[in-house]
Amino acid sequence: MAGHLVKYGKHRTRRSYARIKEVLDLPNLIEIQSDSYQWFLDEGLREMFNDIMPIEDFAGKLSLEFVDYQLLEPKYTVDEAREHEANYSAPLHVTLRLTNHETGEIKSQDVFFGDFPLMTEQGTFIINGAERVIVSQLVRSPGVYYNLDTDKNNRKIWGTTVIPNRGAWLEYETDAKEISYVRIDRTRKIPMTELVRALGFGSDEEIIDIFGGSDSLDFTLDKDVHKNPEDSRVAESLKDIYERLRPGEPKTADSSRSLLTARFFDPKRYDMAPVGRYKVNKKLSLKTRLLGQTLAETLADPDTGEVIAQKGEMVNKDVMKKLAVFLDRPDFKMVTYQPSEEAVVTEPMTIQVIKVQDPNDPERTLNMIGNGNIDAKLKHITPADIIASMNYFFLLQDGIGSTDDIDHLGNRRIRSVGELLQNQFRIGLSRMERVVRERMSIQDAETVTPQQLINIRPVVAATKEFFGSSQLSQFMDQTNPLGELSHKRRLSALGPGGLTRDRAGYEVRDVHYTHYGRMCPIETPEGPNIGLINNLASYGKINRYGFIETPYRRVSWEDHKVTDRIDYLTADEEDQFVIAQANSPLNDDGSFADDVVMARHESDNIETSIENVDYMDVSPKQVVAVATACIPFLENDDSNRALMGANMQRQAVPLVDPHSPLIGTGIEYKAAHDSGVALLCQHAGVVEYVDAREVRVRRDDGALDTYKLMKFRRSNGGKNYNQRPIVRVNDKVDADEVLADGPSMEQGELALGQNPLIAFMTWQGYNFEDAIAINERLVRDDVYTSIHIEEYESEARDTKLGPEEMTREIPNIGEDALRNLDQDGIVRVGAEVEDGDILVGKVTPKGVTELSAEERLLHAIFGEKAREVRDTSLRVPHGGGGIVQDVKIFTRENGDELSPGVNMMVRVYIAQKRKLQVGDKMAGRHGNKGTVSVVIPQEDMPYMPDGTPIDIMLSPMGVPSRMNIGQVLELHLGMAARNLGIHMTTPVFDGAQDKDIWEAVAEAGMDSDAKSVLYDGRTGEPFEQRVAVGVMHYMKLAHMVDDKIHARSIGPYSLVTQQPLGGKAQFGGQRFGEMEVWALEAYGAAYTLQEILTYKSDDVVGRVKTYEAIVKGEPIPRPGVPESFRVLVKELQALGLDMKVLGGDDQEVELRDMDEEDDDVVNVDALSKYAEKQNEKTNASAEEAKAPSTESAPVETKNNQN
């Protein structure tokens, strides 16, 4: 028997078919969120305050310094914040020190900086009572990038971009004549040498001395001539640059100097961030650039004079090993140049210069310039960086160096929560800085305190805006635990500072070889966001620079054995190594079993000797994300279908009694454990008490821990989040063990669906085109039943005419409709309600005249309802019926915070139990989705020889063209597992082989083809062919027909066109569009067409009269003019076109406005005005009083129109 037993948690043992031993456990799956936020609290905040502070006033008298900060206790707990629709946040207090330089007086003070949102243990934020996730952003890393294009004549165009984190871009480019230009901040281009001159190297000789020979440089110097003899070359260049940056302004050398200093050399305006400095130093360092080049000078040890490398020697890895030590020294081959006094930066510039041979012409020597090991703490760019980057640009044209691939993950980095928050907070602080400066100059320096200078509004506004409305702050997907986990691990290339959907081409979206082990090549949305939204691979981590790292096992260079040492490599580090696959066969001592192995190097898959191998993958599943790693037999599925499978697992609805898959992949336990919905034990101990609401654990040190379970809570997606204990009294529990299953969990494992008996067969054409025929048992036994909870809210406000009132006494409502309401008009918990039932009775005062003193007295004594009120009760919307699960009442008296003008708020939760029905969407894990087309009685279902009826019938046509064969393998192995009564694990890329499956089939006593004879439930006859029958994990998805079905007779209309609104959410109608009109015209259905275009749509008067006629039983009147036609006429009139409507006799037809009255044409407003006039006319005759009896009709249609 193949396979071995593996225990997942304490409650589930599976037979695993994995062959590769796990050398590294999966990391905590939400650490991308929690670690980043922790960094922000520990370092990020402090770093930002230190950046902005000290703030000095314009005269330099006062300065405000940052001392320290602390977060106090949060005002609400997580649950209270949810309940009160508040933020889960803590007050931030900052200690500031104000120094008066004239008197030497120092004042320290603690200043409140607003409430700062805290991250929950699950990696989410609670903002206004809703759980939100800050998605990590994938952006282009700051650094220097080189690229090569061709123009229309196939000539090479070289380009360079120096990208900072904040500040002006610097771009170099060549034209068809090989002249090099520079652009500053996307302005017009100027010859590159002008920028060099502005840096203080004015003469051509100096420039040639620095850069050495280069064709492009010579052409550029020829182009850049001295135009104005009155100015020195440096001053002239400064003025030229100023003219490009500020066209039309008077140009002087001084203003240009200060402008360039501000653009590039002021740390407040230009920030490379540590990652930018790291990338620039790495790209321009001679350590990487000298490899593979031939030296044009002899290099010696500056101390001893010993030769390190001879002239004419090629620098290979061995030479570089000796050289590297010296290249890091501050005195090795360093050259210092003194810029002119007029330059932008007048400090001496030190660069590292080594002469190398031109690869195309060995006689010619080239200068290779490094930026001289600039300190990693330096945030802005330096003249040495600019000179070295230009030198790289020139050498690139001579064939030395390499261009950069912008989609390489060494050039894209992750901005996680902490950094995004920091950037947002910085914006708030810099706005505050301006205010502080102004206040410093206004207020009296003697008496002012830090508190008086600080205005925290901009800081609070910036964080509020970020959490509330940033594209990266998203309402958490809480359909099931896997959806939550995936959302927290999502990487988006969209958002502020990122890409936009329309501008992103194919290259950005495509899978890149550096995604291996870093980003999942499978899990990404279908549609316009494909490839822009990705997921972190299962073992991926993010380093301090924001690059994604993935772990590899080190292969010893001496004896070529795989060691236990694990190294995390970024994409550009990995490019230097050869990496063997995780499934390369190994001997027991760690040596490779074969002399030649499959390996990866850069973008190639190669067969190579084991002497060349540097590393080995840690696990086959390190390539994919968590959701993808949940698909068994992933290796047998087409990638497009696997993508759908991974995405649809996130949409599985939590069922009432879920079961974890019989055929798992071994990641189910870890995914459920880290998702945040399971109840985890904090400290080891023994369980003392268990019930449905709490678990108590006696710790080993004697203390008692009480854990409250989450019961029937509404999740973000309206699903039911509920926890069930899985431990018993006297169980010994360890720290971090699962005490209670959350939604979609069973025995501590992820359980997104059920394991029904499935046959691939057709049945009466009911499973045509991905339709699914199901057994009535699945409905009757609540196999796929789920609970959905919806929340409804009603507020009693103060209006101009008096306060609204929650009450049971609602005008014109019978006692029957009030049977479930208490004395305050609020529905009781447990009541069964249907569409249209009242949940909260509420009345709003109507406009009435002031009561006389007598009426007021009567009202006070008898409490008569003398006042006119309107019924504004909260009712159950269409399709919202169910059982009232909970009612929460918030009032000011109870100390609840309500928004201004609100006196009382009632929140009602209604739970629905939804059984599986025709129209619901279901899916397996291999992208095999369909909708339920028929529910067949159990006795009519095909049954197996032992009498077991099939649960689900799928169309066999759904397999071959889709190429997701994984479902067939799962089916067979699942049947074997069911017969053997065990659970199995078949990890991705390392699972059961076909021989393992056939062995399991034989062991389970099944037929050798793994098929079965099936009998027709209606006739008892066997079917002609044997049928593949087995067990597959099958899920019900969140796309349920109950949420989609919709009907309308009368309802709301659009204000301008008076046509019905569209969509279920607006209770809209079906649009009868242009093509549908053609269809009716083709059939000559004139009256149907007329009704559709008038009464049923926007003939305002006709609607009302038709309704009236139906109520009174009179013949339906002729239609009037559709309102949209009038809108069209008005629009044409607005263009100055006189538009008239002519009747059949060429006489003009009068188009009345909606609100004009007429005896024939009656609209709702006219009807109510008419009724009022009748009351006023006391001397009116009886006939007039009886006119159009409009009591019942207008009320309803009036509501419909508003």
Swiss-Prot record:
It holds the Pfam family RNA_pol_Rpb2_2. The keyword Flavoprotein does not apply. CDD domains: RNA_pol_B_RPB2. Coiled coil: none annotated. GO terms for molecular function: DNA binding; DNA-directed RNA polymerase activity; ribonucleoside binding. InterPro entries: DNA-dir_RNA_pol_bsu_ext_1_sf (IPR042107), DNA-dir_RNA_pol_bsu_external_1 (IPR019462), DNA-dir_RNA_pol_su2 (IPR015712), DNA-dir_RNAP_su2_dom (IPR007120), DNA-dir_RNAP_su2_hyb_sf (IPR037033), RNA_pol_bsu_bac (IPR010243), RNA_pol_bsu_CS (IPR007121), RNA_pol_bsu_protrusion (IPR007644). One of its GO terms (cellular component) is DNA-directed RNA polymerase complex. Residues 1189-1202 have a biased composition (Polar residues). It is an enzyme of class 2 (transferase). The keyword Aminoacyl-tRNA synthetase does not apply. The RNAP catalytic core consists of 2 alpha, 1 beta, 1 beta' and 1 omega subunit. When a sigma factor is associated with the core the holoenzyme is formed, which can initiate transcription. Belongs to the RNA polymerase beta chain family. This is DNA-directed RNA polymerase subunit beta. The gene is rpoB.
